[in-house]
């Protein structure tokens, strides 16, 4: 495998370094002091969109080939694929502040599930606005509940069929960016006794009756990132908003879709951890050097 960073990705990394010094790190410090997320109307998000961030992997009904193109010049570095470039950029953003990094506009954690599970109409309706992003917009994902965290098979939010609609009843917590999102991909169960087999995912739009009581969670860290709890009080969702349609779940595929979403993000989480670790090391060394640390050679010589 070729680990060389192509010129385009390197240029984006360098631009992020400048953005990190000017905006990302200061916004993270400000959020820590104020104890609240960076507001969605902040000019930083406009700037980020202007740099091309927040767009979806979905290419529209016609689609496009996103595989790296071979260069005619054998000595020229090939442009790396989107996944590898995303890892490097996520690492760089998290170096400056992970809370600000994960607050970035975009379709959110549910993007992968919509692409892999959604109908063509659902992909077009919910992801096409993110193809050519002209302003900051967000999508969100809601799986976690007060009594169901990593054990996603234990979710209790109910989905009850009512004619052509579904009625959602339950509570969600730690849903990233959900109060500012155009839609939330909400996971619920048609029957808790079915365990994983009862899972269903619904595209719940902002403003739907019964989607209410948004509350930003208080956390020890990631203050710039909006982690939200909310309630579904008999929230009525059209049948067409069931992700993938009813036939998709006949093979107990709901849980597989949820896990595919999480699995797709694991490399990004690892990249972010590397960025945070690099930042912690650099800050620690800078502090030790500036304070001389009794001229300890273990610090002085590094």
Features from the language model and the residues they span:
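Amphipathic, small/basic residue-rich leader segments at the start of a protein or domain
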Residues: 1-104, 125, 129, 161
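Buried hydrophobic positions in well-ordered alpha/beta secondary-structure cores of metabolic enzymes
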Residues: 20, 89, 119, 141, ...
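Glycine-rich phosphate/pyrophosphate-binding beta-alpha loops
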Residues: 148, 173-179, 222, 265-269
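N-terminal glycine-rich flavin-associated loop
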Residues: 98-121, 149
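Glycine-rich beta->alpha junctions and the first turn(s) of the following alpha-helix
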Residues: 2-12, 213-302
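A short core secondary-structure module
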Residues: 169-213
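A short, Trp-centered hydrophobic/proline-enriched beta-strand micro-motif
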Residues: 135-143
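Cytochrome P450 C-terminal beta-domain/meander region
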Residues: 151-169
């Amino acid at each position: 495998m070729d680990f060389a960073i192509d010129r385009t990705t390197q240029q984006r990394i360098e631009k992020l370094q400048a953005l990190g010094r000017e905006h990302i790190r200061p916004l993270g410090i400000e959020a820590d002091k104020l104890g609240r997320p960076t507001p969605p109307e902040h000019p930083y998000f406009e700037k980020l969109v202007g740099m091309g961030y927040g767009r979806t992997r979905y290419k529209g009904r016609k689609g496009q080939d996103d595989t790296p193109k071979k260069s005619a010049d054998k000595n020229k570095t090939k442009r790396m694929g989107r996944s590898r470039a995303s890892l490097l950029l996520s690492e760089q953003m998290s170096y400056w502040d992970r809370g600000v990094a994960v607050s970035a506009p975009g379709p959110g954690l549910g993007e992968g599930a919509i692409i892999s599970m959604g109908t063509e109409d659902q992909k077009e309706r919910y992801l096409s606005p993110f193809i050519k992003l002209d302003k900051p917009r967000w999508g969100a994902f809601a799986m976690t509940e007060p009594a169901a965290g990593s054990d996603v098979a234990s979710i209790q939010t109910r989905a009850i069929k009512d004619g052509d609609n579904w009625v959602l009843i339950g509570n969600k917590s730690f849903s990233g960016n959900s109060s500012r999102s155009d839609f939330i991909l909400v996971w619920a169960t048609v029957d808790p006794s079915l365990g994983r087999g009862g899972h269903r995912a619904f595209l719940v739009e902002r403003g739907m009756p019964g989607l209410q009581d948004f509350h930003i969670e208080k956390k020890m860290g990631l203050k710039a990132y909006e982690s939200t709890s909310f309630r579904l009080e008999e929230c009525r969702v059209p049948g067409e908003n069931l992700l993938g349609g009813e036939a998709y779940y006949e093979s107990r595929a709901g849980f597989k879709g949820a896990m595919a979403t999480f699995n797709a993000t694991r490399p990004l989480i690892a990249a972010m951890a590397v960025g945070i670790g690099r930042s912690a090391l650099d800050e620690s060394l800078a502090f030790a050097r500036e304070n001389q640390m009794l001229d300890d050679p273990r610090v002085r010589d590094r």
